[in-house]
C-alpha cells in the first residue's frame, strides 16, 4: 500500500495505491469548525446535492447514470468529531480494468457534477427537492426517540451541558430543519465551498497521473484556506454531580453516567485511556462492567462504555429494570473505583489484543483505510505500526494511574417500566 499527498493549491489529493480491492473509492471530504447554528443546513445541503442537479434532473436520472457507470454508488455522510464538522461525498466504483471500457473520467465527472452543478435557479435551490430532504431529516430526528439507548444518551449530554458541542445533533433540530429555505441553503452552499478545507482521497489500483488529471479537470475549488480547524472540544467539569430522571414508556430504564477525563497527557489520550476503557467496558464480554452488572448480578442485557477522546468524556450506559436502577448506578461506581487498584495483567493483555485486532481489521475495507489516513492528517493519530507497538507497552500500573484522572459529571436516567417499581 503506497500513500501520497498531492497539493493542488485549494485542495489536496491523497492517493492510496493498493491492488487488494476490485473497486476504486473516491471520497471528497469537506471539513470545518462546528457551527451550531449551521449544522442542520450543512447536513441538509449534502443530502440535497445528491438528490438531483441541473444535468441529472431527478433522483431516477441519478440512479440510471450510476447503473451505466457499472452500478457505481454515490452517497454522502455528515458527522461531527469533537469540534470538527465533516461531510464526505463518496463514489464507490468498479475498477475500469474489469469493465468494457475505461470509464474512470466519466465517473469522476459524475461525482463532481453533483457538487458543482446543483439544482439552483436564481440563487435558490429547487424547493421541491429541498422539501423532500427536509421531510426525511425531520423523520430521522424524530426516530431517535424510538431508540431508547440513543434517546437517553442524547438527553444525558444535554443535561450535562446543553451548550456543549458534545450535546449537539449534527442533523439539527426539527425547528432548525423547518427553517431552511431555498435561498438560505444556497448561502450555506457558498459558505462551504469558500471556507471548508477540501481533501480528496482515492483508494484502489489505478494510474496515479490519470486520476489526478481527471480530478483536477472537474474539481473547481478555488479558495485557499488558512484558518485553524480545531478537533478537540473541551467540556466543563462539575464540583457537584448533576442527577436527573425523566419518564418514558419504554419497557426498561436507560442509565447513563458521564465522566470527565481530566488532565490526560497526549500519550494517555491516545493509548493508556483507550486500554482503560477496553478493560472497563468498551471491549469484549470480559470487561469489568460486564462481570459486575451481568455475570454477578444479572442486571442487564445492554451495557457499554465509550471513550470520547476529542470531547474528554467517558460515557457509560446500560438498560435495566426500573427496580434495579439504583443498584446499577452503585455497581458502576464500584467498578470505576476498582479500576484504581484491581486491574490485572490478563485484563490488560485481553484489551491490548482487542485493540490490535481492530487496527488490523481496519485495513480490510477501503472506507476504513481512508478513515485511517484522514485521521492521521487531521488529528494526532499515529500510524498503525506505531499504535500496535505503543499498545503493547501499556501496563496495568499505567492504566490504574489514569483511573485517578476522571470525575463524575452527570447521572441521567430515562425511566421505563412500571412506575411503582421504584420510588
PLM regions with names:
Residues 78-81, 186-193, 305-308, 400-404:
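Short, flexible, solvent-exposed loop/turn segments with mixed acidic/basic and small polar residues
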Residues 52-55, 96-100, 117-126:
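Short, polar/flexible loop-turn hinges at active-site or ligand-entry regions and domain interfaces
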Residues 138-143, 240-252, 357-367:
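Short, low-order "capping/linker" segments at domain edges
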Residues 182-218:
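Non-catalytic, conformational "gating/processing" segments within enzyme and secreted inhibitor domains
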Residues 14-16, 22-34, 40-42, 59-113, ...:
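M16 family metallopeptidases and their MPP-like homologs
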Residues 14-41, 46, 190, 197, ...:
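His/Glu-based metal-binding/catalytic segments typifying zinc-dependent metallopeptidases
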Residues 1-17, 207-245, 401-423:
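Proteolytic maturation boundary segments
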Residues 63, 117-141, 227-237, 334-362:
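Acidic/histidine-enriched alpha-helical segments
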